Amino acid sequence: MKKAILGKKLGMTQIFNENGKVIPVTVIEAGPCTVIQKKTVEKDGYEAIQVAFGDIREKLRNKPVKGHFAKAGVSVKRHIKEFKLEDSNSLEIGQEIKADVFEAGERVDISGVSKGKGFQGTIRRWNAHRGPMSHGSKFHRAVGSMGASSDPSRTFKNKRMPGHMGNVNTTVLNLEVVKIIPEKNLILIKGGVPGPNKGLVQIRNTVKA
């Protein structure tokens, strides 16, 4: 990938474009992310940069992590993430990556952990059809058939059944960057992005370019 940054989802709002059309946008506080380590082919077998994002009290980190930040000469941060960038050699340890690495009109992929929905049935979790709600029906929101009986005498793996919904890594592709506000480290993305407000997200160049 060419560019990547960590950010915090702040919420959604709407703005007007030059034609007066309303655009729903998600506001993301992107960076600043500090480079704390550079991985090299000679030493690590691959090239990448390790970045840190988000302030945190130092006493909430253990000694190995504190030492890792001290070696880089950077204050302790909340999140650490590796990115494989094409021009990682141009970045130095201690250098900051800010929201202005992206420009309005660019297309990006955004990853985050989706909102947890708890234990849900098949209708909400898998969008299954429900049964008739009247005329003597004894089947409304039940699972329905789970397979044949005597043969194979079991329920197959990956059968769509009730269970925990949400709280999984999710990526939305090819979203448009509507506006950059560099003085506040804000990126406005058209549409919704995964996760709750204040959730961690990764922004990078789209793979569909």
Curated annotation (Swiss-Prot):
Q: Does the keyword Lipoprotein apply?
A: no
GO biological process annotations for this chain's record?
Answer: translation
Output the Gene Ontology cellular-component terms.
Answer: cytosolic large ribosomal subunit
Name the family.
Belongs to the universal ribosomal protein uL3 family.
Keyword annotations for this protein, in alphabetical order, are: Ribonucleoprotein, Ribosomal protein, RNA-binding, rRNA-binding
Q: What function is annotated for this protein?
A: One of the primary rRNA binding proteins, it binds directly near the 3'-end of the 23S rRNA, where it nucleates assembly of the 50S subunit.
Which Gene3D superfamilies does its entry note?
Answer: 3.30.160.810, Translation factors
Protein's name in the database: Large ribosomal subunit protein uL3
Q: Which InterPro entries match?
A: Ribosomal_uL3, Ribosomal_uL3_bac/org-type, Ribosomal_uL3_CS, Transl_B-barrel_sf
The reply to whether Metal-binding figures as a keyword in the UniProt entry is no
What molecular function does GO assign, one term?
A: rRNA binding
Q: How does it assemble?
A: Part of the 50S ribosomal subunit. Forms a cluster with proteins L14 and L19.
